[in-house]
A protein has these predicted regions:
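H/E-rich (His + Asp/Glu) clusters that bind or coordinate divalent metals
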Residues: 13, 22-24, 41-44, 179-310
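Active-site gating/metal-coordination segments in enzymes
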Residues: 64-155, 215, 220, 310
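Charged helix-capping and loop-helix junction motifs
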Residues: 120-127, 152-158, 197-201, 229-233
């Protein structure tokens, strides 16, 4: 085959593949905002992911050091992305770093995934900035390790109500294993992702009811597992907290279809290996929520929190 013919054939094949992927992307009945998509190392791969899973917009969770790269991604695909900012709260300049990024276009703080107590002076300084600038702060709350040697993140969740009460002007978004394990009043200590029926009266359920400044991010295996383990409970939970729940994926698959490495460093989450977390969680929500509740969770609540234009 001549080089010109080869190149022409390659271009046509690539276009056909893109068209096939676009056609196979699910239609969720309206725009969908993924509030938990980490900025990736390769340009435009975040856009590839949201296209593949039928998501229209996403919040790019971005470390302070990568703000310029996130801005480039946003400018390349206008109308699809906004960005967050995260920095180690124990840094002496943490408050200034956050203020600089937020005043330069970041719309939220997070995700905060550090080995600190939720009710610590370092975290208090972050909460103060979030309240000062009117942005949400996303917390990764995990006690059980995903791999040998991993240490807990954002400890002290059983007393988190004290933080919510002490910082009423700060909007918190809870996420991750221990946050979602506490959807039930019966929380095991030997694993991060409990299964089986949910016992009413869980701490997370109670905090969402009691504190207007707490929201819940349904991303990752933790959120998907909590939604899937007891569907009768979930139906009522979604209605009860329809204004406090936001969809997110925290998905690492390459294409919005499950390709690439997913859950590679988290053996306990193997149930979602080879799958797109966004697709899986949206499917559960579509099955269990009414159209109005589905729209609130997948768009309205998150768009309001993260200042995403309609």
């Amino acid at each position: 085959m001549e080089r010109r013919q080869f190149l022409s054939t390659t271009v046509v094949a690539a276009a056909s593949l893109r068209s096939l992927r676009a056609q196979s992307a699910p239609d969720w009945g309206g725009p969908v905002l993924d509030t938990h998509l980490h900025l990736r190392a390769t340009a435009d791969t975040c856009f590839t992911h949201i296209q593949g899973c039928g998501v229209s917009n996403a919040v790019l969770l971005t470390p302070a050091a990568a703000q310029d790269r996130a801005k480039q991604e946003i400018e390349t695909r206008p109308g699809h992305f906004v960005r967050s900012v995260s920095v180690d709260p124990s840094r002496p300049d943490a408050q200034q770093v956050l203020r600089d990024a937020l005043r330069n276009g970041a719309v939220s703080i997070g995700e905060l995934k550090y080995h600190l107590a939720l009710n610590s002076p370092e975290m208090h300084r972050v909460y103060d900035v979030a309240a000062e600038l009117g942005v949400p702060v996303m917390m990764h709350i995990q006690t059980f390790p995903h791999f040998e040697g991993e240490q807990p993140y954002n400890t002290g969740y059983p007393e988190f109500g004290q933080v919510l009460k002490a910082f009423p002007k700060t909007t918190f978004v809870g996420h991750a294993d221990f946050f979602w394990a506490n959807i039930s009043a019966d929380v095991p200590t030997d694993r991060g992702y409990p299964d089986g029926p949910i016992k009413p009266g869980g701490l997370t359920d109670k905090l969402l009811s009691d504190y207007p400044n707490l929201y819940a991010d349904m991303s990752a295996n933790s959120g998907n597992n909590a939604l899937s383990r007891d569907k009768d409970f979930t139906k009522d939970f979604l209605v009860r907290h329809k204004d406090k729940l936001i969809f997110g994926s925290d998905c690492a698959c390459a294409d919005g279809n499950g390709a690439g490495i997913s859950q590679g460093n988290n053996p306990e989450a193997a149930r979602l290996a080879g799958k797109c977390v966004a697709r899986e969680t949206l499917a559960v929500l579509k099955q269990l929520a009414s159209p109005d509740v589905f729209r609130a969770i997948t768009w309205t609540n998150g768009a309001k929190l993260f200042r995403v234009p309609a």
